[in-house]
Amino acid sequence: MKNYFLRTFLYAFVVFLPELTLASERIAYFGGGCFWCTEADFAKIAGVQDVVSGYMGGHVVDPAYTDVSKGTTGHYEIVKVVYDDKKVSFENLVHAFWRMIDPTDADGSFCDRGQQYSSVIFYNSDRQKLVSTRTLKALDASEK
């Protein structure tokens, strides 16, 4: 009986401890222009812990870079931003994103042309959707 409780405690400790220690870690997905440029810009922001380039959307499973860059897969070049929300808010990341890209260009960003380079935020919560929509409307209203 003693071993049962010890095993149960250790299981709970191992399974739930990482979640407790990473409670302030959040993830956001942004796309706009070349993902390497966006990756470098997000990596400079205090509170950002990791930035990884990749693809989202599309109709091809496990697309190759050459196919995505041709615009034939329907994917967007995106970055996954892992951040500590005690050090930087999602809203601050969105404001930084609007400055990194050209949100008024429907066919890419700067010299990167095509749907795969279009500006997009893939939100993963209602809060992220609200912040993304609200800040875009404010940007539109500012006519900047």
Model-based region annotation:
Residues 1-7:
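Positively charged n-region of N-terminal signal peptides that target proteins for export
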Residues 22-144:
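Flexible coil/turn and secondary-structure edge motifs
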Residues 7-19:
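Bacterial N-terminal signal peptides
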